[in-house]
Amino acid sequence: MDAKPQQNPEPPASPLPPEGATAVSPPPPPMRTTLRRAAFGAVAAAVLVAGALVAVPDEEEPAATPAPGPVARAEAAAAAGSPASLSDLTALIGDRQKWVETHPSDAPAWAVLGTAYTEWGSRAADAAYFTRAEKALQRSLAAQPGERGNTQAWAALGALANARHDYVAAKKWGETVRARQPKSWTAYPVLIDAYNGLGDYGAAAKATETFGSLRGGVAALGRTSDMYRGQGWREDALATAQEAADHARTPAEKADALHRLGELAWERGEPAEALAQYEGALRTDRGHLVSLAGRARALAALDRTDEALADYLTVTAKLPDPRYVLELGELYEASGLDGDARTQYGKLRELLGTAKAAGVDESLTEARFEADHGDPEAAVELMEKEWAELRRSAEVADALGWALHRAGRTEEGVQYAERALESGVRNASYAYHLGVIESALGQDGPARGRLEEALRTNPDFSPLAAPLAEEALESLGEPDPGGPAEVR
């Protein structure tokens, strides 16, 4: 049975125990297992950086099959190129902690531990683990510098930077590893995430293609589907995502693939299909909380509000991701429960403060919240800083354009709202924002087209904004008899 993300792999009495503390206490391993684990550290350090436990094939079979157990399953998942379950990831953390306690100069083991901390922190929305990850990776590099071959730790630092949304630093680490090992695939997941975060979609596409040629398998199929989605190639994204699901070999891998199918169905405006995919992911891995959040979103679109609220409350209690807290607050607000909405918005501010203190950049979610529920000028300041620091993704462009409009600077905002859609991504919220901005500028024809696009793409894209999109479209009236307006 998989552990849920809220399960802390450290003793609860001490949020940040010494790195040598043993969270999960496996029985003392036999000598052959101990030696094999030492060798495994060198492999795992190179392959944990993709956000899941993955490994290149090994030409030599281990001398003996280890006894079944969570650490062995995590290692088997790595050998099979699959993500590990959270319970097995927890066990791996405990195992590596115990190992480095008696082998403090084992650089690969520290790199494995650091990357496992990053993975846990990302999947549990617990930024405290990013601090642990950084310390472990520093220990790895102190034992063996990157210039002396420890590129595994460099790549892991890139994955950590991505987890903190520091895409400039992630790009630096990924490109450094690629320059030293151009035929190794381990740098490419780091680079794909970094380039996407910076809005350099051409470089992200090239990195995705190279990753596919070097790595292949379900991980590459998933990345390729994500690339097609970002380009607006829905049919290709769906076909590739389905292929990934069909070839998934472990429950964790299958749940990730089904979640991707759910996200694609949601973006197509098919909440019933999205619900089916999210529930399939949850049947496969009941601790897959991102799919529980997806199910909540789909249930709300299907007017099953009480069930949606229950799911959101479960998710936000176990996975304190600011995005889901914002979604819950907006669902309360759309339901006329303003007091409950304010409670969630207060919780959101607390989470944003905690993330900032831990070095995690959550300014995108913060700007979205401030633009619609707080201080639009503060949202503008946040997004202008992102833009100035070269984080120019479609998400940032959309948020900046909308914040400028909400702050009364509509003429400045339109160029950013347009840029958000230039990547080709089909996003109802982006189209809605641009439509409202164009309407405010008196561009009724383009505005009508954008609002129709938003509602055609996903008529239930937001419990708050979708009804506003319908009202805005109705207020524009019918188009002129000359024909439909051209959508830029």
Residue ranges, per PLM feature:
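Canonical tetratricopeptide repeat
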Residues: 112, 156, 190, 223-224, ...
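TPR alpha-solenoid repeat register
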Residues: 109, 150-153, 187, 220-221, ...
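Short coil turns that delineate tetratricopeptide repeat
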Residues: 104, 145-148, 182, 215-216, ...
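Residue-level recognition of tetratricopeptide repeat
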Residues: 115, 119-122, 159, 193, ...
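N-terminal leader/linker segments that initiate helical-solenoid repeat arrays
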Residues: 3-145, 149, 459-460, 467, ...
